[in-house]
Amino acid sequence: MFDPVIQIRGLNVAYGSQQAVRDVSVDIPSRQVTAIIGPSGCGKTTLLRSMCRLVELTEGVRVWGQVLFKGRNLYEPDMDVTEIRKRIGLLAQRPFPLPMSIFENVAYGPRLHGSLKRAELETLVEKELRAAGLWDEVKDRLNEPASALSIGQQQRLCLARGLAVEPEVLLCDEVTSSLDPLSAQRIEGRLLELRSDYSIILVTHVLRQARRLADYVIFMYLGELIEHGPAEQVFKNPHQPRTRAYLAGEF
């Protein structure tokens, strides 16, 4: 047994007539790295984005079932979506730095949600850039536009920006797929260091990455939850034939 940070109950997501997630129920462990794996089009990203209600931004989407965070269903009508996305942050596949300086990218969220003084912001920006492993590379360039950074640096900047609003959960959607191997390694290292303070949920199509990072694994296929459990058990002794076939590279 473990302490769940998110509890999903009977979750369904459909885009028009196409159902992407079918009756999924699973608990996400707190302060661990949970990897969602499965072939392309299996519903991994849809499941991930449903956890912060970003899936609703797609026109025509329908969501039913429950996503419970701190015991409350995130899809209740009176839930504050802005507050949800502050507490459950998303790091996307491609970095999307804001069109402003490196410093202001990290300071943007805290400015929006609070009233920190300049000195407090400077301390916070340094703290989160260090947490993202970027401080030493940009400490003398904080007023330069974020667009001047490399793609790998931009992804770490987006990580720092996400951490600056102090989320409890960090959703990571194929966050290294557009990066060179060294940049990907740096992001992976940061995630491993951060898991003692954050609950990290990672979508990846790279099984080697899931094996390196995951404490817990969820296997999806054709929108359905096929198997979930501790990473060592799923990778070494999967219970379901479709899990075994996927891990063996048969589809």
At which residue positions do the language-model features occur?
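ABC ATPase NBD Q-loop/coupling interface
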Residues: 66-83, 143
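Catalytic Walker B motif of ABC-type/P-loop ATPase nucleotide-binding domains
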Residues: 170-173
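Helical segment within the ABC ATPase nucleotide-binding domain
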Residues: 184-196
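Conserved ABC ATPase signature
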Residues: 144-149, 153
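Conserved ABC ATPase "signature" region
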Residues: 66-73, 118-139
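Conserved catalytic motifs of ABC-family nucleotide-binding domains
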Residues: 166
